[in-house]
Design a protein with these regions (language model features):
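Well-ordered beta-sheet/strand-loop patches within structured domains
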Residues: 1-176
Length: 176
């Protein structure tokens, strides 16, 4: 947990990693992000700009299914890479869209003042392996906390982000 600007072990301190995983699954499932706040500092377990923080009774993550069909979210833990440490997996099941095959969430730095920096996040939609559109999702602001120049590099196209985004060809969202 981040307490008064410092990392501190606490009960519930890892709950934001679960919220971040659910948030990214929601982005990939094309859910409307109703409420989401970033951390004070960028998280180390997800690209800058793609985190979500929660604090019971104060800060929440809220997403909305705007499709015409029900969605089902399954969460589970398993040792995906054999290192003995389980990872949180989130799968969202729903009706298969026809307009796109995959959504890849991205984020990039848009402003760096030295003490704070801001990012944009977006969904990149793919159909048959080709990018068909981008949709800006959120602007996040973080306190600088030792991030590298690479993490905070500002792309040539500040409004639309990096150009070299590729589909993952993975199925984080299940249809049927």
């Amino acid at each position: 947990a981040i307490v008064n600007g410092s990392y501190e072990p606490q009960y519930g301190g890892g709950i934001c990693q679960a919220a971040t995983t659910i948030y990214n699954a929601g982005l990939r499932a094309n859910m409307e992000i109703v409420e989401r706040l970033p951390h004070q500092y960028a998280s180390t377990y997800v690209p800058v700009g793609l985190d979500a923080t929660i604090d019971y009774g104060n800060i929440d993550l809220k997403m909305k299914n705007t499709s015409a069909y029900a969605m089902y979210m399954a969460t589970y833990m398993y040792d995906n890479n054999g290192d003995g440490y389980p990872e949180l997996m989130v799968e969202i099941y729903g009706e298969k869209p026809t307009a796109y095959d995959e959504i890849v969430p991205i984020a990039w730095c848009v402003e760096n003042t030295g003490s704070k920096y801001s990012t944009y996040s977006a969904r990149v939609y793919f159909k048959n392996g080709k990018e068909i559109k981008r949709e800006r999702v959120w602007r996040s602001t973080y306190d600088y906390h030792g991030e590298s120049a690479y993490q905070l590099a500002i792309p040539d196209d500040i409004e639309n982000g990096p150009k070299d985004v590729q589909p993952t060809n993975k199925a984080p969202v299940h249809y049927g």
